[in-house]
Every structure is written in structure tokens, then in C-alpha cells.
Swiss-Prot record:
Annotated protein name in UniProt: UvrABC system protein B
Domain remark text: The beta-hairpin motif is involved in DNA binding.
Described function: The UvrABC repair system catalyzes the recognition and processing of DNA lesions. A damage recognition complex composed of 2 UvrA and 2 UvrB subunits scans DNA for abnormalities. Upon binding of the UvrA(2)B(2) complex to a putative damaged site, the DNA wraps around one UvrB monomer. DNA wrap is dependent on ATP binding by UvrB and probably causes local melting of the DNA helix, facilitating insertion of UvrB beta-hairpin between the DNA strands. Then UvrB probes one DNA strand for the presence of a lesion.
Similarity-based family: Belongs to the UvrB family.
Single GO biological process annotation from the record: nucleotide-excision repair
Assembly and oligomerization: Forms a heterotetramer with UvrA during the search for lesions. Interacts with UvrC in an incision complex.
Amino acid sequence: MEKLKVHSKFEPKGDQPKAIRSISDGILKGDKYQTLLGVTGSGKTFTMAKIIEQVQKPTLVLAHNKTLAAQLCSEFREFFPENSVEYFVSYYDYYQPEAYVAQTDTYIEKDASINDEIDKLRHSATSALLERKDVIIVSSVSCIYGLGNPEEYKNLTISLREGMEKDRDEILKKLVEIQYERNEINFVRGTFRVRGDVLDIFPASSSNIAIRVEFFGDEIEKIREFDSLTGEIVGKRNHVSIFPASHFATSKERLEVGIKKIEEELEIRVQEFIKEDKLLEAQRIKQRTNFDIEMMRELGYCSGIENYSRILDGRAAGTPPQTLLDYFPEDFLLFVDESHVTLPQVRGMYGGDRSRKDNLVNYGFRLPSAYDNRPLKFNEFQSKLNRVVFVSATPGDHELDKSSNVAEQIIRPTGLLDPEIIVKPIKGQIDDLYSNINETIKNGFRVLVTTLTKKMAEDLTEYFKEMNIKTRYLHSDIDTIERMKIIRELRLGEFDVLVGINLLREGLDIPEVALVAILDADKEGFLRSDRSLIQIIGRAARNSESKVIMYADNITKSMDRAIKETNRRRVIQMEYNKENNIVPQTIIKDIREVIEATKVVEEEAEYDSLEEAIQANNENLEELISKYEADMRKAAKELEFEKAAHYRDIIQKLKKQLSNI
């Protein structure tokens, strides 16, 4: 097995060595729950990486949204270039769940758009877990949803080895059984093609590398890897495992047993409806279920097969579904990032799913077994865990109560202090804020302003614009990608002030911000709790010149706790800096990193101009041309003809450049 090994030019500093040692010892000793309480900018991700290196366990890192998961995955890939770092989030670009509105007699069919790249990354994650031990998976709460039986997934895997006696047609049948499609023309992920004694398979977990199996009679003579686009042979394999193209793939034997049980449940349900004089519902459930059964018999699957997953898995009613957690070995390690947000999210998933399914079951659209195609309940989630580390600057009561060890990470490697907090009266707050904004902008820095209401945020934005301050408003209707673009523009200085409500909290790392203003800080509530205030204060902890202004007429209990905690941390940080002769330095962070979090993790860097691309690849222009040709074909295939034409123009310029060399 490859060892999990961190590659970094940095060594642990400040509180990091103590936190790494303390939590690693706890994991190896058998502590189930621990907390890493790390302030913003203290290098919690690096600490997590070093703990993983110390304990050498397959690891799941749980984040509360796709953007944060992508950002973490990117960082872990830099720390562990020799190991398998995977990304597992929901593969839906768009998802409209199946539902029934009884009041208007409206049935809403499930409608979804699946992101092929993310589906590939999900398959890559599960296959990595079954093939190796040096695995780190960064996931959203998608990991607590049903994923199919890992034992069945493993049993259906096709193992091919050089010199093996294997009937070619038998392999083709098995490929179809695990939901690969035969396609001689459009050779894409999850398909295979046959040309004489040569079988080409495009694994569901691969981007562009396919497998070529060459036969001599019934003997496998050669197994090679090739580029699916160019056909160029890129490697030789002695052995290859082909994992199913769907996590819900089921063997014929299990499918037949499952169909009989579905028919039995259907018969019972129809009789129940007839007994209650619900003839329409009885007819509906019979028609819909029989159609699904017919599809399963003919194709091996049906649309919405996940609703029958409990029966196909052979589980008892009410038992938890199989999830990504079941693909891990028993001794895996879980990090819950931003646990104060992530854990409540995990808690809330089951309730929302159950209420939606009530109508579908009660009105004859689904069998009662559909209830068991669901996310895990919180207690079920906890029962699957073995070693857990909660990671947060503001851990919740649940985390602190559960943890046998809380490791504090208050010292930042850069020497940065928690910001100074100034409390000012509400009267005249806008004029005072205007004056502070001008001073901050004059020094070349940016400003974050957080309000309590949407109307105030909008009015404030308009007011500052009228006062010739470049201001933008970040509201909840803005999607993730647009949000990251706005943050990038703030960092670049395209505007100076960003106004928001509850959007200036976790994951907003902007070193250019030197002032955070909190309006109506004395209004007790969720947005002004001590934990929320500490998170907002943390947004100013990346700049050595930063300060926080709270506008309030009274010091609330939440404000008092947040101010005291921040001052406690400042004292510890100042003493450490004095003892070690450290001068606080503003974090220097590449601006491109902010927007890269929204891309699929494996994407290659785009160049800002053709000249930059040529300069970066001057010795490999032919490779660059091949890359753009692949991009052009992909764009044309997706009917994005303007983009394809743009790539064509680039290719022509590159070829001209090549001829001049």
C-alpha cells in the first residue's frame, strides 16, 4: 500500500504541532470524537493533512457545500500528489424531485440534469475505495444518501488479467449486466465497442483513458491503456478491474428475487387501497409498478430504480440505506469541516425527504418501500462512524459535549492577530461608516458590510453608489459561481465595498479586506449570535491592518461573549509573536484560487490570452494544439458552435506559430 504522505514546503508552526500531536494521539488511542478548534487563517486544512499522514487511515472530509468541497479537494490534492484524493458531491446540475400536490391534483415527475464530469468523479471515488487504502474523499452531505450496495458493486466488478482464459461473449454479457452500453460510433464513458478480437472499454470512472483488451481465441493476450480521443497507446496493464457503470447495478439473480418481492408488496398495497375504496390509487400504483417491473426484466433497470433499492438490497423495512460511508473500511477517519454548519445540515436531511414522499405513497405513485430510499437519520449517521474530528472556529454545543479532546489552534503561522473590535453607537452609523470606508479605500484595502435585512442592504448599496463608492450587494438569489465571481472582482479592486446579510461568513477568505462593519450588532438572534459574530469577525483576520466595527447601543450577551473570546485570542497571539519576534504579515493569496473552487476539480488551468498559452507551452505547441482540438470537438458535440469556432481560430494561430519555429 502507498503511504499517505504530505508534500509541502511548509512545516507546522504556532499551535499546529501541538494540535497535530494531540488529535493524532487521540485517534490512535481510540477516541471516537475530538474537536479541532482553529481560528480563521490558522491553517486548519494543513493540520488535517498532517493528522491524516500521522494516522494512515482512509479519510472522509465532509463539507457543507459543493464549493467548499471543491476548494478543500484542490488543497488536499496539492498536499497528497502521490495518493488518491477524490471528490464526491451530488451529480445533479438541476434536480426537481418527484412530488404530488394533492390540493391541485398535480403530479410532478422527477426531472434532473446530470453533470457527467461529477458522475465520473463519484465513480472514481468508489472504485478508489475498493482498490486501495491511501484514499481521501472530500464530500458534501451527498454522502449520506443511498448509493447502492457496496458488496453488490464489488461482486459485479469484472476482473481481467493477461493470460486469463475468458470467453469474449461472456465478458460482453457481463458488461451489459453492469450497465455498460455497446456503442461502435460514439465511444464515451460507460460504453464499449468490439472490433474482431479487440474489445475497447471506456470505464465509468475515467476521463479520457480507455482499456483495450486483445484476445487470441479465448485467451486474453494483451491489456493496454489508450487515449480515447487520439487512439494512442499510453500504458500496459497486467490486470484491470471494470467497476459497474451505475452504483445501482444489480445481478440478474438478485433482480429476479427483488422483482418477486416488489410484486408481493404491490399486491398487498393494491388490496389496501381497494379496502379503503381508493380505486384510482389502486389502479395507479398497479400500472406504474408493473411498468417499472417490465423495464427491469427487459433492461436490468428502470427510471427511479433507487426507489426499490431496499427490496433489491434485501434489507428489512425501516433499515438505513447503504451510502458512501459503507464503501469505507470500518476504521476510517471522518473530518467534519465547519461542523457548526455541516452537522445541522446532516440532521435536517431526513425530515424533508420523508414529508415529500408521504403524498407519493398515500396517492399511489410509489410503494411504501420508497420511504427507505432516503438519506440517513442523524443517529444512523453517527452509528456508522468510528473516529471523528470536528473542525470549526466556532464548534457547536453538540461537538463540544461529544468530544473527549478539544485541540485549540489560535496562533496563525503568519503571526496575524484577531482583529481589533470597536463598538460605536447606532446614531450616525452610516456617516461614520462612510468615513471609515473612505479611509480604508485610501489605504488600498476593501470593506465588508453586513446588515440584518435585505432592504437595508439594498438601500445601503444605492446610497454608497450615489456617494461615488464602488459597491456591490451579495444577496441569496446569486448562485455559487456568480458569488465567487463577485468575490474575485472585489479582490481585484473592480469595486471596494461588498454588502451582504448572511453571506459574509464561512469560507470567505479575502486578504484584501481591512474593515468589517457589523450593523445592528445588538439585535439578538441567529444572525447576531456569538458564533455568527465570531465567524463574521474572522473575515477580517487575513489582513494585518484589519479592524471590526460593531454598531450597537447596547452590549448584548452574544456581543460580550464574541468580544471576550476575540480579545482572549488576541492576547495569546500577541504574546506568542513577542516571544518569537514575529511581525504579523497579511496573507498573500493567488486571486485565481478563489474562482477555481467553482470548477470541477480536475480541470486544467485556462490561459488569459493566447500569448500566455504559447509562452507557457512553447516547447509543446503540438500538445497544446491537440488539447484545443479536443476542446473544439467537445464544444461542437455539445452544440456550442461559437465556442468551437473560437477554439478553431486558436488552433489556426498555434499552427502558424508552429510553422515559424
